[in-house]
Amino acid sequence: MFHVILFQPEIPPNTGNVIRLCANSGCHLHLIEPLGFEMDDKRLRRAGLDYHEYATLQRHTDLASCLESLGHPRLFAFTTKGSRPFHDASFAEGDAFLFGPESRGLPAEVLDALPAEQRLRLPMREGCRSLNLSNTVAVAVYEAWRQLGFK
């Protein structure tokens, strides 16, 4: 399946929602430190309900060690600064999807390290800043999974 990477997530309910999504879709979740919360935060647990035990979750000290542990998969960054629509990408098993922290998105040095075709944007109405992190992850995962025939 896919790897979902949350880079320094800040809001526990968003991460809890993503844990539940990963449990239901078979994606592996990777959290890049520092986290903006403790893993035993009640809001994180509540959002994830009882799905925590069904999700594959790993914490990493930095993005480089995460990617190394995964064997350097093909990486797509989801960002409001991307110019390529996410639905134009062809996803494959084992791809990794990277999402930035809620308050600021991915740092420029992370985005600049990726080719433009791997910096993807979800469509939004003009004048809107961004979508909720867990909603963005859900849209991305389900589009990629749809492309694989939900297998």
Whereabouts are the PLM-identified features?
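Post-transcriptional modification and biogenesis factors for structured RNAs
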Residues: 1-151
